[in-house]
Amino acid sequence: PYFHSKDQDFVLGVSLGVTIQAEEKTYSQEIIIPVVAIECKTYIERNMLDSCSGTASRIKSAMPYCIYIVASEYMKLKDELPELSNINEIYILCKASNSERLKNRKDNLDPHKIDEVLIIDLFNKIKGHLNSIWWQPSKALETGKIINRP
């Protein structure tokens, strides 16, 4: 059997041992079921966005409860539509464009600082996801909504 694996920069999940027995052969492998996956980039541009979007879709097809986040220092996007992807959020941690990064480097200036408020927001987003109750029938009857995603 084939187990597709994908390296992610950061994953929170559960490690499981999977054993498959067929035709007198036994296959065993450790797999990680992700609940949070974060891809880290120096900057995000269209090709990287497309790649991350595809990865987010594949992960969520196996684990719909997983949130997929891209944490990038700089942005190199123009008219792309990241909101149409399965990426839950893209953080631009320096709140600056890639061209600003390159200009600072060329001018021998310090790099942009990472915004600590965004780091706290990222932490709280993950904490909220991990602490959420994903399915509670009594709550659905109270709100009248079952999925209730933001």
Regions found by a protein language model. Name each.
Residues F3-Q8, E45-M48, D115:
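Phosphate/oxyanion-binding active-site loops and adjacent basic polyanion-contact surfaces
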Residues H4, I32, L84-S85:
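A short, structural micro-pattern
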Residues F10, P34-T42, C52:
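Conserved catalytic cores of phosphodiester-cleaving nucleases, focusing on short active-site segments
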Residues T19-A22, Y43-G54, S61:
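Active-site-adjacent loop/helix micro-motif of nuclease/hydrolase catalytic cores
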Residues P64-I67, S72-P150:
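C-terminal tail/extension regions appended to the core domain(s) of diverse proteins
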Residues S53-R58, S85-I87:
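Short, solvent-exposed amphipathic alpha-helical segments in soluble enzyme
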Residues P1-S28:
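Active-site metal-binding core of divalent-cation-utilizing nuclease and nuclease-like domains
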Residues I38-Y43, V70-Y74:
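Short His-Asn-centered micro-motif
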